[in-house]
Amino acid sequence: VSDIVVIGGGIAGLSAAARLSEHFSVTVLEREPATGYHASGRSAAMFEQNYGLPSTVALNKASAQYHREANGGYLSPRGLMIIAAREDAEAFDDDVVTMGIERISKDRAVELVPILDPAKFTFAGHHEAGYDIDTDRLMQDFIRQIRRNGGAIVTKAEVTAITRQTDGWQVVAGGQTYDAAKLINAAGAWADAVAQAAGIAPIGITPRRRSMARIPAPEDRDLRDWPMFFGVGESWYAKPDAGALLVSPADEDVVAPQDAWADDMVLAEGLARYEGMVRTPVTRLLASWAGLRSFAPDKALVLGPDPDEPDFIWCAGQGGYGFQTAPAASQLLADLVRGVTPALPHDLVAQLLPDRLRA
C-alpha cells in the first residue's frame, strides 16, 4: 500500500513522484522495461524560456533556477538561431518578437554555423539564452530522490485494471496489485486511456509525432559550439548532439498513442527544407526515430486533481515541454496534492488545472 501511485515513468511522472516522495510513500508504475522510454528518451532537450504558450513560459521561468542550480545545474550554453529566406520576412519578424531574438547579419550567421549558404537565406536572428538540458541526469536525479525517500519504481508494469475503492484506488499492473489513496496520471500519450480505465472522463489529449534524424557532422566539422538553428516558423530545426547533427522536420502529425517511429516521407521533406539553407547535402543518416508530444485541446499543460474525482490527479499534456517545465510543474502538482497554496500565481494555476477542460 502506498499513499500515491504514479502511472508513467517519463520525466513528468518521475519529477512529480520525486517531489511527492518528500511527503508521501510513492510507487511509480512504468510499463516499459526502462523509465524514460517514450517521449522523454527522444527529446531534443532544450531550455528556451520564451518558448510556448504564456502558461508554459511562466512554468519555464519558474523552473529556470532549479535547472541552473539544483545538483550542480543541468544547463549548458547552446544558443538559438533562426534563418529565413526573403519571402519569409513577415514570419521572421513574428519569430523575432515571440522568441526575443536579436537580428544578426548574414556574415555573423555563417560564422556561427559555417555550413549555411548565404545565397539561400536573407534574414538571421540569434539568442544566447538557449541551453541544452542534461535530460538523462535530470531523470536519474529524480529517480535517486524517489529511492532515497523510500519510494518504488516498478518497470514492466503495464496497467491492466484500475478500480475505485472506498478509501482510494486499486491498480493491477504487470500482474501485481497496488493500493493507493491517490492516483497520478502521468501517462503521456496514454493519459486519456488511463483516465478511462479509472472511470474518469478523458480530457482530449492528442499525441502528435515529432520525427528526428541524426546525420554525420557536415564536412566533418567540429560543431560543439554551434547553436540550435531553425527554419522560420519552426519548419525544421537542427542541433548538435554528441559530435553529430540532429535534424527534425518539426512535424506535428496526429497519431494514435504508440511506440512511434519516423515517417520516411516526412523526414525526407524536413531534410529537404534543412538542405534548402545549407551548402552540404545530406548523404546518409546515422539513425532516425520519433517521439510523441501530447497536447490538451488548448495546448497548455494539465496539472491537478480531476474536478469530478479529486483523488485522481492529472499530470499530462506536456506537449514537448516536459523537461523545460518539470521543476515547476512537479512542485505545483505536489502543492496541489498536499493542499498547500502554490507558489505560482493563482491565475496561472487556473490555466493549468483540468477544470478548464470540463464544460
PLM region descriptions:
Residues S2-T27:
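N-terminal Rossmann-like FAD-binding beta1-loop-alpha1 element of flavoenzymes
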Residues V5-I7, L29, Y178-W190, S330:
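Short hydrophobic core segments
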Residues A18-R19, F47, G73-G79, A189-D311:
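Active-site substrate-recognition segment that forms the wall
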Residues S21-S40:
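Glycine-rich FAD pyrophosphate-binding loop
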Residues A44-I115, F121-F123, S235-W236, R273:
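Dinucleotide-binding Rossmann-like beta1-alpha1 core, especially the glycine-rich loop
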Residues G73-I82, E102-N149, A250-P257, P310, ...:
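Helix-loop-beta segment of a Rossmann-like dinucleotide-binding subdomain
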Residues H127-A181:
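Helical element adjacent to the flavin cofactor pocket in flavoenzyme catalytic cores
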Residues G276-A359:
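C-terminal catalytic lobe of FAD-dependent flavoproteins
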